[in-house]
């Protein structure tokens, strides 16, 4: 018996990143972690910066970094619209470490006109990218 699947289309501002049948999508919504499987109730929510994990029809997995965006779930399809989508292997770990360090330094030395919200977003994105890299490293070492 074939595994139940649903059509997933994941796009960034630049291109179509993934289009195919999946058994499951795991993503971080603004209200918490979401696990979307075939037959899930209709849903429209914001996505926060973090990891998206897909389980393909053949059982293999693929991991992505999403900078945030919108998730739409319909009975027969899932759409992920994100500003930036990176495959895990495309993440520059050193650049993410530097961005995290820079954001933390800005927050520690904040002046009266400091844009705390922008620094918090930069920090959250860097931490999310590093979590994706860490997850991939753990899976490789198994």
From Swiss-Prot:
GO terms for cellular component: plasma membrane; proton-transporting ATP synthase complex. SUPFAM superfamilies: Epsilon subunit of F1F0-ATP synthase C-terminal domain (SSF46604), Epsilon subunit of F1F0-ATP synthase N-terminal domain (SSF51344). GO terms for molecular function: ATP binding; proton-transporting ATP synthase activity, rotational mechanism. CDD domains: F1-ATPase_delta (cd12152). It is a peripheral membrane protein. Coiled coil: none annotated. InterPro entries: ATP_F1_dsu/esu_C_sf, ATP_synth_F1_dsu/esu, ATP_synth_F1_dsu/esu_N, ATP_synth_F1_esu_C, ATPsynth_dsu/esu_N. It is found in: Cell inner membrane. Keywords: ATP synthesis, Cell inner membrane, Cell membrane, CF(1), Hydrogen ion transport, Ion transport, Membrane, Transport. Its main location: membrane. It comes from the Bacteria. F-type ATPases have 2 components, CF(1) - the catalytic core - and CF(0) - the membrane proton channel. CF(1) has five subunits: alpha(3), beta(3), gamma(1), delta(1), epsilon(1). CF(0) has three main subunits: a, b and c. PANTHER family: ATP SYNTHASE DELTA/EPSILON CHAIN, ATP SYNTHASE EPSILON CHAIN, CHLOROPLASTIC. Belongs to the ATPase epsilon chain family. Produces ATP from ADP in the presence of a proton gradient across the membrane. This is ATP synthase epsilon chain. It comes from Shewanella halifaxensis (strain HAW-EB4). The lineage of its organism: Bacteria, Pseudomonadati, Pseudomonadota, Gammaproteobacteria, Alteromonadales.
């Amino acid at each position: 018996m074939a595994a139940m699947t649903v059509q997933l289309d994941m796009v960034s501002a630049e291109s179509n990143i993934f289009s195919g049948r999946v058994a499951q999508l795991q993503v971080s919504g603004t209200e918490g972690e979401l696990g979307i499987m075939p037959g899930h109730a209709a849903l429209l929510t914001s996505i926060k910066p973090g990891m998206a994990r897909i389980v393909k029809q053949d059982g293999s997995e693929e991991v992505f970094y999403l900078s945030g965006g919108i998730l739409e779930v319909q009975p027969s399809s899932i759409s992920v619209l994100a500003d930036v989508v990176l495959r895990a292997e495309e993440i520059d770990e050193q650049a993410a470490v530097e961005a995290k360090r820079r954001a933390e330094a800005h927050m520690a030395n904040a002046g009266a006109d400091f844009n705390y919200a922008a620094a918090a977003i930069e920090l959250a994105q860097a931490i999310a990218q590093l979590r994706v890299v860490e997850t991939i490293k753990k899976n490789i070492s198994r």
